[in-house]
């Protein structure tokens, strides 16, 4: 979703690597491979482990002894429940299985890069919305619910929608990622969020 949009927005700056290819082809690696929800915890735990950790380690191995910067797309949810006021220096306390594997990948990245002298950046992305042909209740939930509203279908809001969310439009997220790639310091963590929170029910009502 985000990776595809990034490629569409900056096609002349991107070398798209096939998913089954582990070799870096540029000196700036932008790593998007990831699950996107906590739903696999109810069906197959190995999906998150295999996708978020095993493949990730395979790619890291191919980056050894190469002059690259590894830019890892992580999630703001590694902070845990209090994500709206989180700073990059705050302690992480991930709660869901997805965010736990993302935090584990972050720690693997830092350890591996320090061991083998690889430069890195970690980008923690907030909730993202935008046009996506594959929206579902588990992926891009806001887009999914807006789609239901357009079809005049009922939607069920957990807790009445009385919880805060920080949403960014996918194009803005991609622009922010590009800024970090161009100007961000190496071996640093960057939060990418709007900085504005709203009740989820209010977002749906505005939609």
Predicted regions and their residues:
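Glycine/proline-rich active-site loop of Rossmann-fold NAD(P)-dependent oxidoreductases
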Residues: 103, 116, 128-143, 153-154, ...
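Conserved catalytic-site region of short-chain dehydrogenase/reductase
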Residues: 38-39, 72-85, 97-103, 115, ...
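Active-site Tyr-X1-5-Lys
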Residues: 81, 93-121, 126, 149-151
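Glycine-rich NAD(P)-binding loop of the Rossmann-fold in SDR/ketoreductase-type enzymes
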Residues: 43-58, 92, 96, 100-103
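N-terminal Rossmann/SDR dinucleotide-binding element
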Residues: 1-33, 37, 137
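NAD(P)H-binding glycine-rich loop region in Rossmannoid oxidoreductase-like domains
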Residues: 22-51, 62, 78
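Conserved Rossmann-fold NAD(P)-dependent oxidoreductase catalytic core, especially the SDR/UDP-sugar
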Residues: 29, 57-97
């Amino acid at each position: 979703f985000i990776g595809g949009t990034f490629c569409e927005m900056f096609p002349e700056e991107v070398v798209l690597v096939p998913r089954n290819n582990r070799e870096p082809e540029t000196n700036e690696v932008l790593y998007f491979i990831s699950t996107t929800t906590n739903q696999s915890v109810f069906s197959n735990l190995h999906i998150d482990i295999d996708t978020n950790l095993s493949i990730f380690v395979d790619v890291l191995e191919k980056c050894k002894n190469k002059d690259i910067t590894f830019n890892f797309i992580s999630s703001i949810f590694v902070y845990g429940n209090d994500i709206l006021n989180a700073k990059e220096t705050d302690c992480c306390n991930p709660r869901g299985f997805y965010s736990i594997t993302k935090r584990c990948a972050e720690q693997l990245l830092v350890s591996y890069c320090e061991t083998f002298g690889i430069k890195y950046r970690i980008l923690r992305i907030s909730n993202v919305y935008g046009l996506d042909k594959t929206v579902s209740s588990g992926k891009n939930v806001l887009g999914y619910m807006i789609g239901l509203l357009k079809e005049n279908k009922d939607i069920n809001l957990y807790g009445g929608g009385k919880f805060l969310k920080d949403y960014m439009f996918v194009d803005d997220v991609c622009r922010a990622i590009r800024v970090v790639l161009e100007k961000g310091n190496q071996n640093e963590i960057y939060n990418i969020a709007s900085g504005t929170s709203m009740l989820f029910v209010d977002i749906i009502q505005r939609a």
